[in-house]
């Protein structure tokens, strides 16, 4: 019954439920997990969003289209999509992940969305998979528009500092916690015009640096 409810939320009734079950299974729970589906779903999602943006913004250049796509397929956005269907309630996690609140973790939720896209593709074909992506992303695609806000925090911070002829920020990993498959990075970011060092956290060094850059942007009040 639980999976029946989820399928209604997703807008797709699976012919082969094994695809859905695999998409919901995190690597901490079983060897037969969603990692391969996630790989395939990532490619389908990038194509789907790229196609939608190409058609919606005929005057936008490659850089603007790439930045908008990055905004729509990033971890935080995928986690928003996951929460719309309360995906965390249906995840199959190992005991450790369950205890640490893995069903709320953005990285796990976002990976599962990508896996679900692949599962729908394998179950019903590319047209159905694309239709579901556009259904889930309808509001986000309506709201997105070209502009500075689409640039990632590190790029925005760097361009601001270069524009004011200031030194580039210095990032340094100061702490790594957790097992290899579930690491958390803490990064410091030194900016010439800020008296205090800012910090960021994330499931990878890159994400932690982006988070730290965002903290610097907010302190510098960069628009």
UniProtKB/Swiss-Prot annotation:
Residue ranges occupied by any DRBM domain in the UniProt entry: 152-222
- Species in which this protein is naturally found: Histophilus somni (strain 2336)
Q: What are the RNase III domain coordinates in residue numbering?
A: 3-125
Q: Where is the signal peptide?
A: none
Location within or outside the cell: Cytoplasm
Specify the protein name: Ribonuclease 3
Q: Which family does it belong to?
A: Belongs to the ribonuclease III family.
User: How does the record describe its quaternary structure?
Assistant: Homodimer.
Cite the entry's keywords alphabetically. Cytoplasm, Endonuclease, Hydrolase, Magnesium, Metal-binding, mRNA processing, Nuclease, RNA-binding, rRNA processing, rRNA-binding, tRNA processing
């Amino acid at each position: 019954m639980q999976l029946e409810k989820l399928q209604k939320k997703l807008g797709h009734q699976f012919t082969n439920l094994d695809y859905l079950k695999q998409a919901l299974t995190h690597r901490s729970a079983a060897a037969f997990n969603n990692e391969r589906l996630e790989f395939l779903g990532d490619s389908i999602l990038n194509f789907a969003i790229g196609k939608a943006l190409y058609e919606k913004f005929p005057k936008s250049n490659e850089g603007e289209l790439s930045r908008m796509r990055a905004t729509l397929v990033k971890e935080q956005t995928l986690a928003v999509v996951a929460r719309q269907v309360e995906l965390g309630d249906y995840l199959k996690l190992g005991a450790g992940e369950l205890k640490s609140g893995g069903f709320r973790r953005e990285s796990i939720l976002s990976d599962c969305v990508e896996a679900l896209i692949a599962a729908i593709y394998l179950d019903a074909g590319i047209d159905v998979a694309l239709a579901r992506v556009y259904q889930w992303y309808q509001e986000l695609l309506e709201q997105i528009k070209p502009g500075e806000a689409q640039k990632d925090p590190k790029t925005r911070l760097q361009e601001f500092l270069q524009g004011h002829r200031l030194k580039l920020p210095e990032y340094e990993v100061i702490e790594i916690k957790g097992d290899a498959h579930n690491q958390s990075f803490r990064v410091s970011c030194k900016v010439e015009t800020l008296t205090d060092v800012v910090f960021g956290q994330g499931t990878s060094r890159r994400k932690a640096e982006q988070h730290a850059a965002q903290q610097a942007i907010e302190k510098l009040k960069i628009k």
